[in-house]
Amino acid sequence: MKPGINEKNGKPEASRPKVRIMAILLALFVILASLPFLVPHTGLLSLFCLVPLLCMEHIGTENGVKRMWLWHYSAFVLWNAATTFWVCNATVGGGIFAILANAFQMSLIFGTFRWSRRVLKGILPYIFLAFLWIAWEHWYLTSAQISWPWLVLGNSFARTASLVQWYEFTGALGGSLWIWSCNLGLFGLMMWAATGKIAQAGRVALVSLPLMYILLLTALPVYSLLRYKAKDTEPDSTLDVIVLQPNIDPYHKFEALTQSQQNALLLKEFDAALAEEGYDSTGITLALAPETFTGGIVNGNIEETSITWRQFKAYLQDKPGMNLLFGASTYDYTFSKNAPSYNARKCRDGSWVEYHNSAIIMDRSGETETYHKSKLVVGVEMMPYPAFFSKIDNMLGGVIGRCVGQDEVSLLNCVQRDSLGRITGRIPVGCAICYESVYPEHCTEYVRKGAELLTVITNDAWWGDTPGYRQHLSYSSLRAIETGRYIVRCANTGISAIINPRGDILEETEWWKPAHIVSKAGLEDRKTFFVTYGDITGRICSLMAIMILMSVAVRAFVARRQQKQA
């Protein structure tokens, strides 16, 4: 074999200049892919961000670069680190694991793509790559127990909501498909020119192919802008809302104030907000406090176990139309010989306790409705595959979170009562708790069950002043478009906001400052296409990816068998 020839594939090994070009392309990918998640109104960069990565892969393959998986993995690690480094502020180990594990899955997709090129030719491997990537995102959003869908490509447009009004039909994965289509289209045109095929093309191809690509780039944004202007932003009915941002440092929550003192301070701020804005609290009003505002509540025995419930009930006695929705840490105790579930922990008195991250709504009657968060953060709140990991966790002394979530979503009802305590009105409200607002189809479940308004209660203080809380806020804009609902967002340290069905942030608070919003939120009863039919894009791409993968596997098996026989 001649020097400089790769012994495995017979192709010339890459020279140093080409390796440098690959490094530049890797860096360019990281920059272009990261900016939409870090800088407002840069979502359009995602339509070109994958081209450097595809070029890097092409150069590496053509020049026999060894360990291409390491190039892919490095690119994805850097992208994940640049956009989600802030997770380390809450948990260093969890943050590093999220970055490395997410990047590993992304590089595994590219590894499968490279394997498919052994039997697929032309554009088919690239089509398979796009389908496989979106299938993975769909799996992350719907089925995976270890799930971190923060960097779904369609989320790139979260701060460019006017360009993706069509998410009401496709959801965020429609954005992922558009991004892949535009990137592959540009990459194809570049390869067409670089290989000299452009000289062999006829006039029709020379004109039609670039025009088709321009149409692919512009058709959806043009439609979206027209749809954005045409959308009716005046709802038929509204609900008065009060959003309170207490700005309590969760790392020092009980060092300065007891829970009773925090409750009193919250209620005082509610009164100040009402007085400042001149609102009449006898009308139906929804007041919100953030995620895990209080704790120590035993489900089924809230009257005896919660000072918060007693203080809130006393406060609401002269406010017949006010409903208070707040986050709470709640518990279920069971006295039995065996654990009621893998997530239960044993207490000293022999009972078993199960933890919940909950949202509770109540009015002056003291009656409550509770929803337990069902999309839980892996490690911190939820133990994946508990039949296996519970044994490991027990050996480690219980370091993994074991919150128990609901099997399906339920609604909280904002009620209005007359002077005799009779219910005269009821408004169904969906409440996504923190991380749940990242999941499109999860949020559509509230609307399918009849929610006329969506709320998000969250903490968002764990990450510090980083891009994390801004990204989290922006994803609520996408959920508003997908569901066609107003979203009222209450965050402990910011940013709290009111968002309309176009994804516009109508009002918002500042970060790390006590604040309140007194406003009106629209009530809607129509269902978008995405709510009615779900994530069709994700399901179709998953089906196509499975079919192509099976075809590749069969063809690879047959080819290998023929080689052995030869």
Where do the model's predicted regions map?
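Conserved hydrophobic/aromatic beta-strand scaffold that supports enzyme active sites
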Residues: S34-F37, G111, V243, A359-I361, ...
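CN hydrolase (nitrilase-like) catalytic-core segments centered on the catalytic cysteine
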Residues: A130, L286, T294, I302-Y333, ...
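Generic structural signal for well-ordered alpha-helices
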Residues: I109, F113, F270-L274, V409, ...
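Short, conserved active-site loops that position catalytic residues or coordinate cofactors/metal ions
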Residues: F37-L54, W79, Q245-P246, S281-G300, ...
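Soluble catalytic regions of membrane-associated enzymes that act on cell-envelope
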Residues: S224-G379, L411-G425, C431, Y435
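Active-site catalytic loop in hydrolytic enzyme cores
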Residues: V87-N89, G93, L141-A172, S341-T444
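Non-cytosolic juxtamembrane linkers/loops
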Residues: E7, A14-P17, G196, I214-Y279, ...
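Membrane-embedded alpha-helical bundles of multi-pass enzymes
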Residues: K2-K229, D465, R479-A480, L506, ...
